[in-house]
Amino acid sequence: MKIQKHKEIYWGELRGASISKTRKDFTYLYGSTIIFHSPDQVYFENKLIASGQTIHEWSSSWNYQGDRQVPSLPLLKRGRSYSLTRDMTSYPSESVFLKLIFFDRYNREVSNHVERSDKMTFTYPEEAYSYKVQLLSAGVESFEFHCLRIEEILEESNG
C-alpha cells in the first residue's frame, strides 16, 4: 500500500453559524475562546459545549458568488480510497469525533462516517458530488488543532 500526499488542511476563517445561513464551513463561537497562534496552531476552549455539537466544518463545495470563498477541501475521485488524519491534542483525550458526510449533486446526503480515533479510511462513493468534514464535541473542554490530512491510498500491483 502506497500513500499519495495531499495538501494539509488548516482551520481557516472564523464563520459563525449565524453568519452562514447554509451553515457551510462554520465555527461554533457561542461561549468559545479561540486563539490563532499560527495557521497550523489553533487553540479552542469551551467547557460548556454540548456533546454532539459541530465545533468546526470544512466543505468541498462552494457558491463563490454568494460566499466569496474557495473550497477548503480537495476534490476527490469517485471510487478511490483515502485516509483522513487529524493532527490535534484534546482534553480530555479522545473527546473530539471526526465526521465525514458525502452529498450527491442535489445536496442530498449519500452517506456519512463518524470516527473517534485520529485516523479513518474511506472510499469516496460513486454517487458523491461533494463532501464535508466536521469536528464534533464528545465532552471536549479544550483542544489544540494543527491540521487535517487527506491522502489517497494507492494499491500496489504485484507483477
Swiss-Prot record:
Family: Belongs to the accessory Sec system protein Asp3 family.
GN (gene name): asp3
Keyword Protein transport on entry: yes
Keyword annotations of the record: Protein transport, Translocation, Transport
One of the protein's GO biological processes: protein transport
Inactivation phenotype: Loss of export of cell wall protein GspB, the protein accumulates intracellularly in protoplasts.
The organism's place on the tree of life at top rank: Bacteria
Subunit: Part of the accessory SecA2/SecY2 protein translocation apparatus required to export cell wall protein GspB. Binds the Ser-rich domains (SSR1 and SSR2) of non-glycosylated GspB, binds much less to glycosylated protein.
Organism for this UniProt entry: Streptococcus gordonii
Protein name: Accessory Sec system protein Asp3
Entry function: Part of the accessory SecA2/SecY2 system specifically required to export GspB, a serine-rich repeat cell wall protein encoded upstream in the same operon.
Taxonomic lineage of the native organism: Bacteria, Bacillati, Bacillota, Bacilli, Lactobacillales
